[in-house]
């Protein structure tokens, strides 16, 4: 009897535990959250609901609703109006993507999420999923992962998964909500002007700009989306129901909340001149599905989702209340998913808080090293042999930057927080070889000046050195949001500085620190070694030094084509066939090809590609196969190679791009080592948009190209037949 009683007690305990676990699971389910949100909505006043629809979604003490603090996280955490916390600043987006390793992007975002939580941030306005359109005059090029929709999709999904977490870890105490921006077609701007209108076909929208957002929603479950400043074919994105409802929500299945870009609901009045006042602008935004009004600094005179603007209109038109409830519900749902209702408010001492860790800063170095692209290396000038170098000139406006008294370093690029330190190229080289090599530093000129006053000192430094590291490019003074330009030359007198140093006859390594592809014809023709480093983050100088002296073999590849001249733009590898015959389809007196193509990058070693092979040379339209290629390191040092696969439907019912990237993989090979790299070929890789804009795989032949870059000479091909 006693045994039966004990067994009963154990069973009761077991089922109680199971019930509790099930209840816990259910309490966190979407259905349970919906019930909680509905209860709160029924208790909230109109004023309280409207207050919820602004950035930070402020706390409501009466109902126990927590706030949801925002920040930027493009390449590390930035608090937008504040610079504290000693946050880790990683390489800028264009640099991080140059690694061609999504897992590194994911790790960066995961570390950023931890730093965000440490500062009480739970909602970040990143990543930027804009596909670069090939017009480098546009200042925000640096925020993009590149010119290819597949590449941007892979990097974007990785970033979102890192920032938000996956599975049971999604939105937990170590992760935050990501925001995919700018929906959609933002870089298709006229004259390279930020926020310029986007006139394009629906085909181009779907082929180029929409895929990264589709992947963000369907694969990564992104929690928030931000529309672009611009209009799309005459209808501003912030009131564009076709984009925000029909495509984003109904077609893609997005179920998060939409946050405006800064002041953009208000700009329906002040920029687009559609709304006659802020109230009309607010109603247009609400009806289109914009849930949160971002006005940085919460300037009441710019806000649209504000009691003073909306309340009277809503009370006079009760039918509009459903839009208020809808927006508020989506924001409250996000707070529940983040677990904010159960968390204690975090008290931050801005004077002492330290968010970055040694682990994060070491990873920032690894990411910077893997992002560096070698564009040229005549006669194997690099790597330098420290035993043969007694003196080294370090010259250029971007060679060094002191800690700013206000804001953050200009050489980190846009959307950067303030790290505890920044390692410049000068710092990195001194640290690397300063005990054995005399470093002769001269600035030469300022990045945004036309004065040549510093030239004599720079020329002297070069003449008195065995070799020269010349660091030029751009900074946040000449690039970034609001940094649109009419030409792509090195700004100021930097080109003249390069010419002057070249005339000394000393071996020169040009290090580019920049945020956009530049027109660098003189450098490409006359300087033996060129390193593209973009904005390499807080450890940039260490990474550059490690590459220059051979401790790191550069393995990055371009994600953006370099134009020869501004007259070429837009320049990307995504081209359709040009007119052929009578010399047409070409520029007269100039080369229309890029100076450096998409996917290009050199190494201190060499690689040999075998002939690509298909598991099946013929498949059904709904079938799959695999293409494989052997890659061998034929050099003397270990190196990384990014193997790229491009696909073209040879003859189809609509015009297509000459080829499109559909797979890539970065591999490491020891000298003499061979690896086989394989890529899947199926619907996702072979489909096109037919005349009805539907994704289909059409019967016929497909050219599958595998190789080291998008350039035809770097690719080997095999033909696939689809029946």
Curated annotation (Swiss-Prot):
Enzyme Commission number(s) of this protein: 3.2.1.-
Presence of the UniProt keyword Hydrolase in the record: yes
Output the SMART domains linked to this UniProt entry. Fn3_like (SM01217)
Which cysteines pair up through disulfides? They are none
Q: Which GO terms describe its cellular component?
A: periplasmic space
Enzyme class comes to hydrolase
Q: Where is the signal peptide?
A: 1-19
Task: Kindly list the places in or outside the cell where this protein is found, as annotated in its UniProt entry.
Answer: Periplasm
Entry's induction text:
By ulvan and rhamnose.
> What keywords is this UniProt entry annotated with?
Glycosidase, Hydrolase, Periplasm, Signal
GTP-binding: present as a keyword of the record? no
Query: Can you provide one Gene Ontology molecular function annotated for this UniProt record?
Result: xylan 1,4-beta-xylosidase activity
Name any Gene Ontology BP term: xylan catabolic process
**PANTHER family, alphabetized:** BETA-D-XYLOSIDASE 5-RELATED, SUGAR HYDROLASE-RELATED
Q: Which family does it belong to?
A: Belongs to the glycosyl hydrolase 3 family.
Q: What does this protein do?
A: Xylosidase involved in ulvan degradation. Ulvan is the main polysaccharide component of the Ulvales (green seaweed) cell wall. It is composed of disaccharide building blocks comprising 3-sulfated rhamnose (Rha3S) linked to D-glucuronic acid (GlcA), L-iduronic acid (IduA), or D-xylose (Xyl). Beta-xylosidase converts Xyl-Rha3S, a product of alpha-L-rhamnosidase acting on Rha-Xyl-Rha3S oligosaccharides, further to Xyl and Rha3S. The enzyme is able to degrade 4-methylumbelliferyl-beta-D-xylopyranoside (MUX) in vitro.
Protein name as it appears in the record: Beta-xylosidase
- Give the species: Formosa agariphila (strain DSM 15362 / KCTC 12365 / LMG 23005 / KMM 3901 / M-2Alg 35-1)
